[in-house]
Structure formats: C-alpha cells, structure tokens
Amino acid sequence: MEFSAKQIAAFIQGEIIGDENATVHTFAKIEEGIPGAISFLSNPKYTPYIYETKASIVLVNKDFTPEQEVKATLIKVDNAYESLAKLLNLYEMSKPKRTGIDERAYVAETAKIGKDVYIAPFACIGDHAEIGDNTVIHPHATVGGGAKIGSNCILYANSTVYHDCRVGNNCILHAGCVIGADGFGFAPTPQGYEKIPQIGIVILEDNVEVGANTCIDRATMGATVIHSGVKLDNLVQIAHNDEIGSHTVMAAQVGIAGSTKVGEWCMFGGQVGIAGHLKIGNQVNLGAQSGVPGNIKSGSQLIGTPPMELKQFFKASIVQKSLPEMQIELRNLRKEIEELKQQLNK
C-alpha cells in the first residue's frame, strides 16, 4: 500500500519541503533508508544521515534547518517521533485482519465472544470468560474461567490471563506474560511455610501494554491494579496487591514487592527494585538498578542504592573510583602519625 507525501502531511498536519507527490510503501531507519521508505529524524546525533539517506520521505521537527542539500522530501512536524508513531499505527490498522474461531481452539460453551474476534489454533477460553470486540487471541494463549478481556486487545502466543482477572480495552499482552498467578504469600510455621490462598484478582485498565514474560500477581484479597496507559517491558515482576499509577513506564527486570503503590507518570530504568508496603509519588524517575527501601516523594529523580539525587550520585561515583588510592594514602598518614607520636613520647 502506497502513501504520498501529500497524504501523509495531511494526516499528521505537517509542512512539506520538496516533492508532495513522493510516495512510500515501507518504513526504515534513517541510516538504512531505501527508495520508497519513510524515515524520521528526532535525535540530533543522527543528523548527518539525513544528507546521505536514500529514504524518499523523512519526518523532521519544525526547528530543523538543513545545512546542505537534502535529496529526500521533508515533512516538518511538531514532534517527529510522535508523528512516526501515528503513521506506524495507521500502517498496522491498514493490514488485513483475520476474524473467527479456529476449529482447533477451545472455547467454553458459556464463554461470551464479541464481534470480529479472532481466536487462533490451540488458544483456550475458559468457562464464563468474556472476550470483547475486535480482540485477537494468538495460539496457545489462555483466558481463564470468569476472566474478562476488553475490546481491541491482542493476546500473543502463550500469554495467560488467570481466572476472574480483568483486562481493559486496547491492551497488549506479549508472549509468555502471566496475569493473575498467585502472589508470593506464605505463613511461617514450625513445620515450614504454609501457603496463603490468593483469592484476589488483577485488574488491567485501558491501554496497558505488558511485555514478554512479565508477571503480575493476583492479590491476596482485593485487586492488584495496573491503571490506564501503563507500559511494562519484558521480565517485569509486579507482586500481589501492588497498584501502578496511570502512564507509568518500567524497563526490563524491574521488580516491585507486594502492597506498594506507585504514582502516575513514573519512569523506572532497568533492574530497579522496590521494597514492599511503600508509596512512590507521581512523576518519580529512578535510574537503572536503583534499590528503593523507603517512600519517595513526587517529582524525585533518583539513582543508586539507597537512591540519591543525580548530582550526589555522580559525585559519590567519582569518589568511589578513588577509594583504593585514598586507602593507601590513609594508611601512609596513619603510619606517619604513629611515627610522630613515638618521637614525641621519647
């Protein structure tokens, strides 16, 4: 399917610099651009590529001014990266979609299936489960009894939504993710650890995306809640009774212990660990591998274990590199002081 620069500019409200009749049929990174491809430039580090790219159309920010000739047709927009996302969504929507239930899928008689749903081979839909309109269930995905999946969702292969859990509209669950497994709850006894039944559920609100092999545990009682717009990377662990605020994003291998509340619009780097029963405010940014043992107020930008402000962390890092030399210097100073004491005592 081809689109012209004129059509694209109209869709994303951009200004064309060059040939409005230039057409594209695919996407490419600016450094790998080919004729017939559309690319984008948002990071100044990649500016040199715009003068040599073979892409037919390039999205650029409005403040971009070429320093030499650019062969590609440019479309100037407020935010090139955001406009690219809109075009990619349009491209995905233009692809033909399958509907219907494959004969090799298992769908319980009591399940409710919406309109234009596709259920692939070997998918399993349990008793009294509900699947919303236009949702796609890929092979070997499982929706447990009584679970509810909203409209326009995608459940990729081997993703699992346990019984009675709730998934909102426009959610994406990537391969191998598990929604609603038991929380890690055990009571210590003289005979060992006795399992505490986890009778709660997980609620995913609208527009949530869950990465591959990410686990969100069901609550002991009540609900583990992931609010609207949350994006979780691969291999993230959300424990029982956690609550994650709207539009918070977490990179791979973040782990959050039970009953912690995370605010809205937070950003956590990879391998961040947060202890249980804490409150993390809104718009908190945590650098990679931060370890959080206590509450954090809104607007904080922290890194390290325990987390500290960025300036303090980088100052401490510089000092840390010098510790071996400082240790030698300290030993020498102690030795000199002891020698001076001995001389004074004579």
Curated annotation (Swiss-Prot):
It holds the Pfam family LpxD. One of its GO terms (biological process) is lipid A biosynthetic process. It catalyses: a UDP-3-O-[(3R)-3-hydroxyacyl]-alpha-D-glucosamine + a (3R)-hydroxyacyl-[ACP] = a UDP-2-N,3-O-bis[(3R)-3-hydroxyacyl]-alpha-D-glucosamine + holo-[ACP] + H(+). The keyword Transferase applies. Keywords: Acyltransferase, Lipid A biosynthesis, Lipid biosynthesis, Lipid metabolism, Repeat, Transferase. Its EC number is 2.3.1.191. InterPro entries: Hexapep, LpxD, Trimer_LpxA-like_sf, UDP_GlcNAc_AcTrfase_non-rep. Homotrimer. Belongs to the transferase hexapeptide repeat family. LpxD subfamily. This is UDP-3-O-acylglucosamine N-acyltransferase. It comes from Bacteroides fragilis (strain YCH46). GO terms for molecular function: N-acyltransferase activity. GO terms for cellular component: membrane. The keyword Repeat applies. Gene3D superfamilies: Hexapeptide repeat proteins, MurE/MurF, N-terminal domain.
